[in-house]
């Protein structure tokens, strides 16, 4: 782990640790110690698994994913069966799954609980406090978080089909990072200042389908907004002002070139012209 310098202690970093949002015990108030280290590299996949992944990436990039329209939520697609390949691992920028539309979940069975459990395991493994499903390559509207960032401490939240109802007028600018924009194997960690409302009201469902209504402030509000952005296909550099964006742009372009090298048949959105 690497702790930020003292002057940055109050900059609550979204996903600054290895794999998610992380806050450790602090002397008082909203002061948090933070680390930017990420997690383990994904296990090598078989040739068949790689072929399936390549096909799925092309389908997502071309908008051909097989999803059903949900009449209750306009053009938002829905899924009645959850499927994924284990073990899950972190999806890195600019993988098109981070920009793809995320389907509403209409099934509340053991598969949903198993998916959430696997996401929590990745989150804790990488010392995070929050994780959204598209960040592990599953394009559904699901997020998990625990503000304490430690298994057995704090409360675990599973939010299904979350909606942002309203946000307060007050905002705060803090440094953020993102597990999808880091690669410990090459010592790459992208961070930048992001302004967000410090209060939000949200509605969602839990893993049983029961309705959840929450008013979140400060740290939890920031966790929720960062993960909710992922469900909207919005990435944290989209929230940066132009000056801050220009600081991280070279590293974003580097990650794009690295991804294209390993996925030559997949088209991605590039920031090179911005």
For each feature predicted by the language model, list its residue ranges.
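Positively charged
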Residues: 2-274
